[in-house]
């Protein structure tokens, strides 16, 4: 790798780190919506980076709807209604320890709206291979009841729900599961204790999908999502 290429890669890394730092400040309200960010030189001095790194960081956040650069005016912080919360990096920056509960709350509202419909669609659109795979995952979940492995349960549970979105046959729903994988993982990790979770309701979804019962699949998923997780 040539020196110029190394420098370019280092510059790119610096701009990403700066974009994350600026995003965190914006998310915390330190740079409020409607305010103008400090200029390139001031930000460069503040974070110890070049003006090029600042410009690239601003471009990154502008692409996510967080900033709006304007000549002779400066870079304005945009209101949250303009932010692209479907951006994986923005989700990761938002989902800090302090924000986790709020992010999950917002995520579950979206999940509760989509996943029952995904189950209903899976009952009518899935193929035999997908249904077989879902049954296999259900078997693995059942086996974990007698020999529980927390990390393995999280992996299988995630695979189960991701597969249902795929089985729906709707590309937007499949993308939803892929996009929010990090939130799913952190959420399932948070709610999983030392035992299987709602095994009967997971089975009810599998049974309904297997038999092509659209409404039953929808209702079973709704029951799964609405029943609170009990910890012992």
Tell what function each PLM region has.
Residues 10, 14, 106-110, 129, ...:
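A generic short alpha-helical patch detector that favors 3-5-residue windows
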Residues 86, 92-100, 110-126, 139-143, ...:
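Hydrophobic, amphipathic alpha-helical faces that serve as interaction scaffolds
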Residues 79, 106, 133, 176-179:
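Residue-level recognition of specific faces of alpha-helices
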Residues 1-113, 120:
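Short linear motifs at protein or domain termini
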Residues 31, 112, 124-131, 147-150, ...:
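Alpha-helix boundary/capping and short turn/kink residues
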Residues 135-138, 142, 147, 155-156, ...:
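C-terminal all-alpha effector/ligand-binding and dimerization domain
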Residues 85-91, 95-101, 129, 150-152, ...:
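Inter-domain helical "communication" segments and dimerization helices
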């Amino acid at each position: 790798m040539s020196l110029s290429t190394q420098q370019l890669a280092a510059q790119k890394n610096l701009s990403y780190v700066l974009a994350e730092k600026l995003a965190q400040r914006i998310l915390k309200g330190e740079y409020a919506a409607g305010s103008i960010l400090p200029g390139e030189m001031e930000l460069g001095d503040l974070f110890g980076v070049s003006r090029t790194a600042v410009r690239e960081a601003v471009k990154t956040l502008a692409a996510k709807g967080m900033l709006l650069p304007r000549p002779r005016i400066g870079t304005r912080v945009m209101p949250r209604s303009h932010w692209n919360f479907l951006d994986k990096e923005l989700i990761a920056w938002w989902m800090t320890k302090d924000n986790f509960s709020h992010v999950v709350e917002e995520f579950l509202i979206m999940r509760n709206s989509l996943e029952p419909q995904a189950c209903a669609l899976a009952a009518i659109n899935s193929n035999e291979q997908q249904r077989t795979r879902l049954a296999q995952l259900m078997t693995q979940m059942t086996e974990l009841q007698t020999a529980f492995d927390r990390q393995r349960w999280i992996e299988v549970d995630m695979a189960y729900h991701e597969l249902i979105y795929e089985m729906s046959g709707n590309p937007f729903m499949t993308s939803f599961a892929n996009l929010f994988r990090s939130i799913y993982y952190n959420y399932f990790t948070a709610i999983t204790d030392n035992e299987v979770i709602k095994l009967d309701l997971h089975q009810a979804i599998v049974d309904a999908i297997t038999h092509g019962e659209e409404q039953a699949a929808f209702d079973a998923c709704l029951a799964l999502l609405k029943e609170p997780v009990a910890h012992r």
